Amino acid sequence: MPMWLQALMWGTLAGGALVLGAGIAWMWKVPPKIVSTVMAFGAGVLISALAFELVDEAVEGGGLLPTVLGFLLGALIFVGSNALLARAGAKHRKRSGGSQPSEKDSPGSGTAIAVGALIDGIPESVVLGVGLLAGGAVSPAMLAAVLISNVPEGLSSTAGMKKAGRSPAYVFGTWIGIAVFSGLAALLGYTALENAPETVIAFITAIAAGGILAMLADTMIPEAFEEHHNLTGLTAAVGFLSAFTIHHVGG
């Protein structure tokens, strides 16, 4: 299978985990504590993956300076975008409770939530495509991290959308659209950087890593703590060790 097609396939699969989570939340009422537990575990998995699969490899391939600058830029881009979207009604887009506004309460919030969810998922998909450049195959640890974190993201956000009165067409249109864009982002990450210097690849990888960490701190971890409370840290630690084990065995 051509590498570009693999990038498209893995990115779409990763985005498809959001659709799976959305389907579960729409069909069944999942207890909030279960959602929070899985989300805390997924946050730990992602932290491990971005540390060992992204930042560490970016430093080895392109050096410390491009990695540091890229990481800070990625965090700044996410935080800035998140602040703008929060003003438009997307502040609680990952919340499973009644925090999400309806379109009636906050006109334009539906679009903001959809754009926010897209911004959350794109960096993860880009690094799947970029990872193919380095190893010739998708990173098992990074793929597992994205899949494990995306299911509770889709589940929690959809539960909140449902309570806010969003229609099935809006909910599933949003997640299916993001799955498609995730595939395209992975494809772009591979094709655009196929012949790029190592420093550029390191810089782009670090941008994605910085965005992912900012997303975790601003959205996933607060949602996990809301219901899971004192066990959030322990559950995240188990997730971290699980991803590190996959990385160590796979490496």
Per-segment meaning from a language model:
Residues M1-G251:
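Intrinsically disordered, metal-sensing/regulatory segments
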